[in-house]
């Protein structure tokens, strides 16, 4: 179940802000986990979302689907005591809060660098399309299926990743 605002802040305040954060080492994309958690702990949800957006276009997906117990949470120093920071739940909270409140919208630069076609609208296709759009490319995504989403839509069960995302 998703965290409430109060639960998310309390959970974020448990972070020890390690000098050598294992959570970043355990994250395949090296998210700045301590910084986004610190901002969340202070109630700066928009800033936390901005930090996440620096590395991922899909925090709502990553917060639900990534194997946190093997990655960021598995490398959390508090894991030694059996209770690591619930990083995935915090990422999910920030992404959902942003979607509900419509807080952050990145400024997309003018499309001056040419046209790019992306084949497939799964997580990789959506990520590269978003990154290229932020670099000023005009991006067209092609998808063979009736609905975009790839494995996000067709390969992950509804209870794990709601289709509305």
Regions found by a protein language model. Name each.
Residues 1, 30-42, 51-53, 80, ...:
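Beta1-alpha1 glycine-rich phosphate/pyrophosphate-binding loop at the start
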Residues 1-115:
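Ferredoxin-type iron-sulfur electron-transfer modules and their immediate structural context
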């Amino acid at each position: 179940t998703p965290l409430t605002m109060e639960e998310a802040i309390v959970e974020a305040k448990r972070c020890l802000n390690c000098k050598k954060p294992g959570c970043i080492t355990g994250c395949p994309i090296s998210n700045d986990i301590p910084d986004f958690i610190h901002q969340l702990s202070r109630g700066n949800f928009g800033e936390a979302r901005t930090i996440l957006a620096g590395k991922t276009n899909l925090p709502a997906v990553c917060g639900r689907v990534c194997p946190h117990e093997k990655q960021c949470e598995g490398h959390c120093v508090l894991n030694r005591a059996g209770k690591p920071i619930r990083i995935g739940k915090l990422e999910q909270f920030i992404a959902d809060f942003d979607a509900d409140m419509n807080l952050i919208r990145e400024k997309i630069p003018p499309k001056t660098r040419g046209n790019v076609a992306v084949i497939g609208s799964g997580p990789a296709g959506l990520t590269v399309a978003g990154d290229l759009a932020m670099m000023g490319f005009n991006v067209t995504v092609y998808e063979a299926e009736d609905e975009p989403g790839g494995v996000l839509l067709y390969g992950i069960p509804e209870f794990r990743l709601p289709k509305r995302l």
